[in-house]
């Protein structure tokens, strides 16, 4: 369906640490996957249950510490950091401060670009298509 409706990217899979081009039925597509991991999603930190035994709510500082740690490793490896956020979760006052803290931390580093998914795929598409072409030679 993503091909049929002309999607440029997807961020639905947890299967890699780097972006890649999708194939459908063994055929190449233009759809870029921007994979992410649960540690880079806001939901696991703040979704909770009032029924025991259940998950308890985390402090926003736990999210900030985890995301800064992930950023530091990914930055050292010259990799992309894909974050999953939900307005009803991250948009709470104390939680948005944690996101601001991550952005401030990231921007203290050189050559960091924070962009929308469509901007990222436009930037990385030529390199991914070139790599796929060279791999099939």
How should each PLM-predicted stretch be described?
Residues 1-77, 133:
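Active-site-adjacent pocket scaffolds in enzyme catalytic domains
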Residues 9, 57, 61-137:
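C-terminal domain-boundary segment and adjacent tail
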